[in-house]
Amino acid sequence: MLLWRQSDRPRFPLAAPRPDWHPADGRPQAEQAAILEQLIRLPPGIAAVTAERGRGKSALAGMLLRQLGGEAIVTAPTRSAVEVLASFAGETLRFMAPDALLASKEKAAWLIVDEAAAIPAPLLRQLVSRFPRTLLTTTVQGYEGTGRGFLLKFCASLPHLQSFTLSAPIRWAAGCPLESAISQLLIFNDEAFRDAPMGELALEAVNQSCWQTQPALPEAMYQLLSGAHYRTSRSICGA
């Protein structure tokens, strides 16, 4: 962030050194290649690939589809949601909307579900039960319906689920200051519940003035609610 007063000469601080960024060239990155190798050898069952935005989940699904040829059906909340996947899949994409797929008798060796967290869990459960192998991809970042409940509820109920995570950004360089600023602004970093609470519990009333007097407190509360899969939305921040 740069603060410039009109009466002063602009002074631009030196940016911290960051690794060079190179746009994706269609070939799998290191993390993608390692996961792709395991998915190709996946025994009958369900695999899930989760990551923050811009890490190449949909691209990975498209690469898998290209290798599978015509042995897979792709579904997603909307046809437009698989545009990235389709760009990596080549001519092998066979897409069906979730409800249409459920009503049909279509069969395939694989089912690939992009943005799986946006599909109602009962419908998703029926779909995955019909195919020998299923790949689910979703983000775990953001508000209700974008992934956190998918991890806490749906994935936790699947026996022998194989989980994979992509951490290296592909759409932008590692350490991108804009990504960090947006994550902080929209409170994307949920409470991970890594440490058990210690000591006695204290009940305390919280009001809107906390944003001015104790800004860390309402932010921590929001992270707690989001991590616990409460129905969070942007409006809560100003409630």
Regions inferred by a protein language model and the residue ranges of each:
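Conserved RecA-like ASCE ATPase "motif II neighborhood" in helicase/translocase motors
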Residues: 91-129
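Conserved RecA-like ASCE P-loop NTPase motor core of nucleic-acid helicases/translocases
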Residues: 50, 70-82
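Conserved coupling/interface region of RecA-like P-loop/ASCE motor cores
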Residues: 1-25, 155-194
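Conserved helicase/translocase motor-coupling segment
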Residues: 203-239
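N-terminal pre-P-loop "Q-motif" helix
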Residues: 23-43
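Signature of the SF2 helicase/ATPase Hel1-core->accessory helical subdomain module
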Residues: 122-161
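Hydrophobic positions on the alpha1 helix immediately C-terminal to the Walker A/P-loop
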Residues: 60, 64
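Conserved lysine of the Walker
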Residues: 57
